[in-house]
Each structure stands twice: as structure tokens, then as C-alpha cells.
Amino acid sequence: MTRGGPGGRPGLPQPPPLLLLLLLLPLLLVTAEPPKPAGVYYATAYWMPAEKTVQVKNVMDKNGDAYGFYNNSVKTTGWGILEIRAGYGSQTLSNEIIMFVAGFLEGYLTAPHMNDHYTNLYPQLITKPSIMDKVQDFMEKQDKWTRKNIKEYKTDSFWRHTGYVMAQIDGLYVGAKKRAILEGTKPMTLFQIQFLNSVGDLLDLIPSLSPTKNGSLKVFKRWDMGHCSALIKVLPGFENILFAHSSWYTYAAMLRIYKHWDFNVIDKDTSSSRLSFSSYPGFLESLDDFYILSSGLILLQTTNSVFNKTLLKQVIPETLLSWQRVRVANMMADSGKRWADIFSKYNSGTYNNQYMVLDLKKVKLNHSLDKGTLYIVEQIPTYVEYSEQTDVLRKGYWPSYNVPFHEKIYNWSGYPLLVQKLGLDYSYDLAPRAKIFRRDQGKVTDTASMKYIMRYNNYKKDPYSRGDPCNTICCREDLNSPNPSPGGCYDTKVADIYLASQYTSYAISGPTVQGGLPVFRWDRFNKTLHQGMPEVYNFDFITMKPILKLDIK
């Protein structure tokens, strides 16, 4: 496992001499070519049909089966940037092989960071070694069940698309293994890669597998269940529609990659094979969630806690995990309703969230928001509820802040009891962020003001925060004076209808410093593993935009 970095501090692994040589070779041969920026790795994967293996070269070749780059800029901007195009090469491949080589290339390009991310997150999730056996057993059964259904129902479009996603994760594993072998490091196991992809699901799976001593209500820290803030804002004359998302979780998860994928999957039931989204090393999903899809759909998500432990006992392995269902729905759906229908199948009851599916095809600027513009989808174990909520959006905004919207979901999850015991902070209408969004959303008129509200934290002066650095849009639990811990809001992504048409967004990594809040430094929390991360987070918003064109040489 790589732990490089000057002064013994966790840092990014240095590129191996061979890889560096291959990266520099084109510069030595073609002197007219401008030098590549430091830390940008190019690679192309070639499927070898006879051997059923993948060959990889450290060049960008548009005739290859998957090609792309990884810009390892985590230390300078807080983000790595990955862009991959697959299935556009000189040979015709099946959709499964296209997905496999796309996964392979991602694994090959990002393996060192995948290792770091696993190292950082494992101790956050597995606090007792005894739970790991139960998790592994559950996940092995779930994987076996999934693959059995993919084989059995080849003509079913849902299972066919599930097969594409599983081919991609298999490729990710093989590609990461290839890179590890080249560098002489220990390869990650397939289970470790599945564990990474299931981080969101594990937030509910682990409590469901843990024995509860009594019926006591466990109230989690504000960030440890992956809580987030999201906002969709429509301007008064429908001149523009803006959307944004700020992730909350442990700061141990701050190793970030923004991804642009373009996979040439030809299937009558595929609606989106090109997408841009915020993500993490080794994740084939966003987790946040923040997706811009070629179907014209935007997907945002915030997490709902399930305080009803009886519900969590309903979780079984013969289901599809949330990350898998999100990926299948993203690929297949061309409308909010269709997304909700697909996502509802084989509900695992893990990573129980509120999803906002915004259909930009239904938005007629300066004219109307047609029916179907916004669907809200919420999941708990054994039940998914969704509804068309464009009417609310027409009034100006849709906020999301970790309290369920649908009454049944709210009641079954145990929120009424929480309100009874702990007060209105847990209610849908009077949660602190509900009040702040209601008060301030009218000030959002463009991407700059959207950035401002989504990084907002004025906990010392805002009456709705009552002195608590997490009773606000962008939480800083590390500033909680009685009991600081390294968790909270650590990113923001912002876009509008115009940017989305170019798969573009503005993104910032790290805890908010708005209003003069102190910059986050790891030296205050050195016991928390943060391998591969910058020591200090003080970055600006950067523009995320895919740059690979068909005409690359």
C-alpha cells in the first residue's frame, strides 16, 4: 500500500519510472508537441478478442477501445479529473466488453487513489472487526444473486443493463490489478472494490447487521450518515433553472475525482451513455449524488436516516444495492417517472435517500415548466415512494436537507418520535436548513449567488443556527467547540440549464471558509487516516468540463 509523500506525510504515489518514461517518450520524439501538464496520465485500452484480455498503452489513441486521461490535481485543486471514452475504436465490441474496458481503464488510471480511498474509509465504516464477516457474507450472497439473474434473464432490459454495470466493476478490478502489478504494490481484491462502491449502502447495511441492545433511538452525528444539502432554483420568469449540491460526510472521504464518461453503448433501451458527475476513486457512482446525464436528466440526492430499527431488519441480500439501481436507472430512464419505476425494482433498503430527478427536456425557458419536470423519489426498506412535484418548483425552489418529504416515509422512518423527543429541528418544515433555504433562496439569481447559499455557514450570528456549526447549509463539525470531529460539508457542485447542456459544472472541494471561517487543516485531526489528501483545504471553485473530442490525434 502506497504511503509516499515528503516528510512522512500522506501523499500521492509518485509515477513509476516506466510510466513516466512512456509519458515522456512522445515529448522526446515529437519536439513540436507542447509539454503535458505534470500529473496528467494518458492511457488507451485495447480488447484482445482471441486472448480475451486487455492490453494497455500509456498514450491516447482514438482507435483504441477505451481511451482517456486522469489529471491527478488533488493537491492543487482538491479534485482529480477523469475522462474516458469507450466503444468508439476501430473494432466493434459488445456492450458488455465496452463497459469492461471502460472500467479497466478507470482502474488502471486511478488505482493508487483507489487504494488510498479504501485505506481512509475502511476504519470509518468497520469499527468492530466482528461486523466484517457479516458484511462480507451479505455482499457475497448479494453478488452471487445478482450475477445469477443477469445470466438467467438475458432478454430482460433491466437485467441486461445490470450486466453492463457489473461488467464495468469487473473491468475496474482487473485494470487496478494491472496497475498494481506494474508498480509492485498489492492489488485490491474484488471484494475491496465492491466494498468501496457500496459505501453508501453500508451506512444502512452495517446497522441492519448489528444487534441492537434495546429499542433506544440512536441519533447519529449530523454528517456520519452521508447527509447533504441540495437546492433546485427557478428564476421568477423561468429565465433559468439552477441546481446545486453540497455533500456532508466524514472528511476521511475527501479524496475526490470528478468524472466524465462517454460510452458508445448501443441498446434500444439505453437512454444515457454519456454523463458527468462528482465522484471518488474506485466508485462507479457519484454517492453524493450529482449527475448530468445525456438523457436530459439531472440527478441530485440527500440522505434520509431510518430511525426505525425494525425496518432495517428487513434488509436481505436478494436485492440490488442502491448504487447499482441508480446506475441502471440513469442508463435506462428518459423521464423522471421512468427513473423512479426502474430504481424501485429489487429495493435493498440500503442507502435510503431522497432523489430529485430534474428533466431539463420539460423546461421551456421564459415560458413553462411542463409536467414531469421534477420527480421526488424516496426509499426506505421494503418501500419506495415517488411523486411529481413540478408544482412546488414553479413556485420558485425545491430544497433538500435530510428530512423525508413523503408523509408515509417520514412516519415509517421514525421522524415523528424524534420530533416528540428532540423538537422541531427534525420536522420537514422547521428543520434549521428548511428555514434558512426558505429565507435566502430568493437571493439566488445566478451561479455566483447559488455558490454562496450552498457554501453558507454563519453559525455564530444566524439565529436559525443557534451557535451550532451544523445547523446550516454547509456544516463544519470540526468547529463544534465542545466536541470537534472531522466531518461535515466538504464540497459543492453548481450548474444551470445552459452549463448542463455542455456537461459542465462548477465544483469546489473542502470544508467551507465562507464569512471568514478558518481553513480546515488535517494536523488538528491526524489520527483520522487521510492518505493521498492535501494537508490544507483552501481551494476555489473550478470549472468541470469534458475536453475529449472525436478528433483527438
Curated annotation (Swiss-Prot):
Superkingdom as given in the UniProt entry: Eukaryota
Glycosylated residue positions: 71, 308, 366, 411, 526
Record-annotated membrane-spanning stretches: none
UniProt-recorded Gene Ontology molecular function terms: phospholipase activity
Paired cysteines (S-S): 470-475, 474-489
GO cellular component, one term: extracellular region
Keywords: Disulfide bond, Glycoprotein, Hydrolase, Lipid degradation, Lipid metabolism, Lysosome, Signal
A single GO BP: phospholipid catabolic process
UniProt record similarity statement: Belongs to the phospholipase B-like family.
Its biological purpose: In view of the small size of the putative binding pocket, it has been proposed that it may act as an amidase or a peptidase. Exhibits a weak phospholipase activity, acting on various phospholipids, including phosphatidylcholine, phosphatidylinositol, phosphatidylethanolamine and lysophospholipids.
Assembly: May form a homodimer, each monomer is composed of a chain A and a chain B.
Record protein name field: Phospholipase B-like 1
Organism: Homo sapiens
